[in-house]
Structure formats: C-alpha cells, structure tokens
Amino acid sequence: MNIKAPVITIDGPSGSGKGTIAGILAKRLGWCLLDSGALYRLLAFAARNHGVDLTNEESLKLLAAHLDVQFVGATEGHPQRIILEGDDVTDDLRNEQVGSWASQVAALPAVRDALLQRQRAFQEPPGLVADGRDMGTVVFPEAPLKIFLTASAEERARRRYLQLKGKVDGVSLSSLLDEIRARDERDTQRAVAPLKPAADAIQLDSTELSIEQVLERIMSEIAIRDIAG
C-alpha cells in the first residue's frame, strides 16, 4: 500500500448511508473514492449476464480477475458513472435484486480474494475514502481513521424505500425491511470477512442523525488526527 496516501474507511450494513457519506466526504477532501460494494454488484451483474452460476466460485474468481470496468468520476451535478464492458450500468447496479446477488457472491472466499488487490489499487494521493463492509478490517487495516456507520433496520428500510419509491415498480417498505434483515444476517454470519467494526473503529449510529451531522462528526475526527493536512 502507498503509505503516502491516507485512507479513511467507512463500513456498515446495507442502507446505513455509508455510500452517501463517503461520496460527499471524498468530494470535500478532494480525495479518491472507492465504492467497494459497486465491485461486488458489478461482478454479480456481469455473472448473470454471462450465465455464470452465482455459486460457482472458480468461474466467479476468473470473471472477477478480468472484469472490464471503468469508474467515471463524479462532476458538478453528475454522480459517478460505472462502465462495464463499454456500457453504462450505474442505474442497473442499484437494483435491489443485484444487491441481493452481490451479497451472495461476496460470501465466497475466492471472490473476495480476487477483488482485494483491485480495491487496494484505489489508494492513491492525495488520499482515499473507501466505503464497504470490510474496508477497515481486511482491505485497509492500517487506515488512520475507520468509521463504522449503522442505523436501525427499520430506518435503513425507510431510507431505501424513499430512494426507490417512484423509480421501481412494486417496491414496499415491508419487503425492503425483510431484504435488509436477510442481508444483515448473510453479511454478519459469512465465514470470510464478516461485517463487523474494526477494533479501533469509531461507531456512529445515524438513526436519528442528519447527513450533515454525521459528516461533522467525521470531519472532527479528521481534524483531531490531522489526516488531511
């Protein structure tokens, strides 16, 4: 790892707001951004497109090593776009079904190992904000600041419902709550890199906090550690 490029990790369960927080934080700091969940979603989406069984560990490992993917950085008024094999699949990856597939493939040790170096390659100057589920425990264990962001399952389902309402047909709050609870169980119980806070992580419960309040707390921790210079 490049010791000249500091890393801030933001881990947490599905719907905790870590992606939103990480994106805003990276923009404020002028740092690189790693959405590790997108890599797993990309792999699951590509596997389905290529007819690869989501339980076939060796085939998924091979596919992970050769993913033709580009991340087009966010600009003013335009979010980051994700290009897979020449096609913009950003919106496809936010589908709840793709998220469920991603949770399945993320439980496979060979898949996590194949994507590990791809994730670490994002660590470049002036710094990196990395969001995911094992950023602070496995991918960047030496990061000077680790955040574990959570919220109640009910609040996370409510947030996801508001995101999807009007965009996805047939979405319901109860079904989203069931899916979040199922993903929590898969993510925390998997044998390799289970979802858990790093021993030195700062745990933030965002159930009753606004986005700005969470950001203020993180910026305070950055200042205390003098991470961003």
Swiss-Prot record:
Gene Ontology MF terms: ATP binding; CMP kinase activity; dCMP kinase activity
Gene Ontology CC: cytosol
EC numbers on record: 2.7.4.25
SUPFAM superfamilies found in the cross-reference section: P-loop containing nucleoside triphosphate hydrolases
Keyword Cytoplasm: yes
Family: Belongs to the cytidylate kinase family. Type 1 subfamily.
Classification via NCBIfam families: cmk (TIGR00017)
HAMAP family for the chain: Cytidyl_kinase_type1 (MF_00238)
Name the record gives this protein: Cytidylate kinase
Organism: Pseudomonas fluorescens (strain SBW25)
Lineage of origin: Bacteria, Pseudomonadati, Pseudomonadota, Gammaproteobacteria, Pseudomonadales
Chain's gene name: cmk
